[in-house]
């Protein structure tokens, strides 16, 4: 997810080390070939392409289906304070579909977002509200006729970490958005997540463990429709900058996901 307010950079979010200009991720079903060797099967999983400016902010992104087919391309622009000011969405063929323009107050807090279609007609305006600590606590979307079309409420712990997203009004037309609950470690990384369906029932639960670099190394997941928790472990092959080139996910010592990344550095 894009962090709207300035501060930090998108390298830290992934996380990657060094001055990365571009990272491309592909994912496959893993196939065991003997005790140690693992092959790539069919394309399946998380695919993306990110391009960064020299300051580590994301300037371009490509989003894909689970089968590795490009869905859309996005460009990000920033104001002189480093805040995200414009987000432009394109089809894979390069046709503009949506523009999002972000506005901030003098404290640098995101206050509103105007969503325009490819012809430049405004479709929706989102408004954000904050608590006394400066945490974003409410996000409300309005259509051009003033009708409320979506509403989210955000809850924080005493460290200002978002521990719950509540869906008060489901956005129309999009895939159903459920509520999310989260817990954090001392480094501020998410160690627990629970996704709830729109009716409030638990859909899936996840726990995460990280190494000192902030990379996810193991965890548990209880997928939708299952009662048993599954433990998984990642094994890495790194490049000379310390970023992983290959990451293999194991469940019960059996490889299940094979992911690879390509990096371009400044």
Feature roles, as predicted:
Residues 1-266:
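Buried hydrophobic residues that stabilize the cores of well-folded domains
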């Amino acid at each position: 997810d894009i962090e709207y307010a300035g501060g930090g950079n998108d390298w830290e979010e992934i996380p990657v080390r060094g001055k990365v200009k571009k990272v491309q991720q592909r994912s496959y079903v893993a196939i065991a070939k003997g005790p140690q060797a693992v092959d790539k099967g069919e394309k399946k999983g998380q695919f993306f392409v990110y391009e960064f400016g020299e300051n580590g902010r994301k300037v371009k992104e490509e989003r894909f289906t689970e089968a590795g087919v490009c869905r859309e391309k996005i460009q990000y622009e920033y104001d002189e304070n480093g805040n995200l000011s414009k987000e432009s969405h394109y089809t894979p063929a390069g046709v503009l579909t949506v523009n999002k323009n972000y506005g901030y107050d003098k404290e640098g807090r995101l206050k509103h977002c105007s969503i325009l279609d490819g012809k430049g007609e405004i479709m929706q305006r989102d408004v954000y509200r904050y608590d006394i600590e400066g945490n974003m606590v409410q996000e409300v979307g309005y259509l051009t006729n003033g009708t409320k079309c979506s509403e989210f409420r955000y809850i924080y712990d005493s460290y200002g970490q978002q521990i719950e997203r509540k869906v008060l009004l489901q956005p129309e037309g999009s895939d159903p958005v459920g509520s999310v609950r989260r817990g954090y470690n001392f480094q501020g990384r998410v160690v627990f997540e629970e996704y709830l369906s729109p009716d409030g029932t638990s859909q899936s639960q996840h726990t995460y463990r990280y190494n000192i670099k902030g990379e996810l190394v193991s965890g548990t997941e209880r997928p939708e429709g299952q009662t048993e928790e599954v433990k998984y472990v990642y094994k890495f092959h790194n490049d000379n900058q310390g970023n992983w080139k290959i990451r293999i996910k194991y469940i019960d010592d059996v490889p299940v996901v094979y992911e690879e990344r390509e990096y371009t550095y400044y």
